[in-house]
Amino acid sequence: MKREDFVFNGSGDVRLHGCVLMPENDVRAILQITHGMTEHIGRYEKLAEKLTEKGIAVCGFDLRGHGLNESQMNIATMGKDGWEASLNDMHRIYSLFHGKYPDAPYFMLGFSLGSFLLREYISRHPKEMKGAIIAGTGCQPAFVLEIMKFIVSTQIAKNGFDDTTDLVRKLSFDTYNDKFKPCRTRFDWLCSDEAQLDEYMNDDACRRDISSGLFHQLLSSMKRTGQQHACVGWNKEMPVLLMSGKDDPVGNMGKGVVQILHNMEKHGFKDVKLCLYEKARHDIFHEYENGTADKVTAEIVRWIGDNI
């Protein structure tokens, strides 16, 4: 595997860090990854190692306000136009690597916050990709999201768009953690593998909190993608792989992801597969201790291979 880090001009000419991990031999396919909230693209190197062994190149970038990009070091925030800009950033990476390898089937993976970005991206570019992997996603009742948006808007008025508050911390992370009391850390809901959780918390490229503004943007996206007609404009022939832990509060312990599956089937999608993993929490890519992460990697390798 060969890794290349690079900097590119994102939407609005914002400089963003990206990387691509290339197989030693010919490129059979490309997987573009959009990472989750507060983390960065470098956390997917183990997954990329297995994919590159099969000739699948892996590319991605640190979302604005995340990872190696210039920003506040403790709070992830994408700026007032950041959600829309990030969708455009995703398309710039697609254009870059599809342009280099126009004959390689192109797949996209979105995890957590990245899953909601990907779901919106597919609505805008339904014909671009060969298949989509949507991991760590969910859906919530619209009225609940509206109430939360209103509360968060009061916090934006109080402390600003790019800052956070104790109430936003509670709504964004701590509520999820309540399901796993007694808790060792603020982030027990992410992963049951304590070694991996400690690695995440000690990673200087990971943020500790999200801004009130970014949380409001995420809630807005959750509302948009949660509408029953949200997938109507997608390519119904495109293979879709849904992945989630059965103990993931973002996916309502599996129930929300099943709801997404049923909605897609109702709208006539031909090839949707759901993988729910027992005893796995939100970050299925780092649940190594109970074997989930290895199963997830093997499934992705197999699924892409079957759809090339």
Model-derived segments and their meaning:
Residues 1-25:
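N-terminal cap/lid segment of alpha/beta-hydrolase-fold proteins
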Residues 79-99:
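Alpha/beta-hydrolase active-site loop
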Residues 267, 271-308:
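Catalytic active-site module of serine/aspartate enzymes centered on a nucleophile-bearing elbow/loop
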Residues 35-39, 112, 246-247:
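Active-site glycine-rich loops that stabilize anionic/oxyanionic intermediates
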Residues 43, 48-73:
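Conserved alpha/beta-hydrolase
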Residues 242-244:
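Short beta-strand/loop motif that positions the catalytic acidic residue
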Residues 101-112:
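Alpha/beta-hydrolase fold nucleophile elbow
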Residues 120-205:
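Alpha/beta-hydrolase-fold enzymes
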